[in-house]
Amino acid sequence: MPLSDFLLPMENVKFRSEQDIEYSEKRYSVYVTDRRLILYARRGLVMRSDDIVSEKLESIHGVKYREAGFPFKTATISVVGTSTIDMKGPPSKIKPLFFSIQSMVNH
């Protein structure tokens, strides 16, 4: 099923990650809607299934960004809500995601 099948009525995607981001040792596309943060992936070759992690924006009470590593830096965003979601990837891809989440949470 495509992501659109999992969106709520009148829910609009405001940001989509350019490349997959790592969360819990799995790769996901990240979407920020006007209501939720959604991590979405299609898994399997023959028996396809959807893998979704979702957090309501109103439940998020903290967003943290950090970079580590030399010479190859890795960026991490920690989103604190009902649980903590730690997403990793290259800084050039993670920073725009951080700013998008931060602007939607502070909205």
Language model: regions and residue ranges:
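Short acidic, Gly/Pro-enriched loop/turn segments at secondary-structure junctions
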Residues: 45-49, 64-77
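Canonical phosphoinositide-binding patch of PH/PH-like domains
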Residues: 81-99
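Active-site beta-strand termini and strand-to-loop segments that position acidic
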Residues: 33, 77-81
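Short, compositionally biased strand/turn segments
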Residues: 28-47
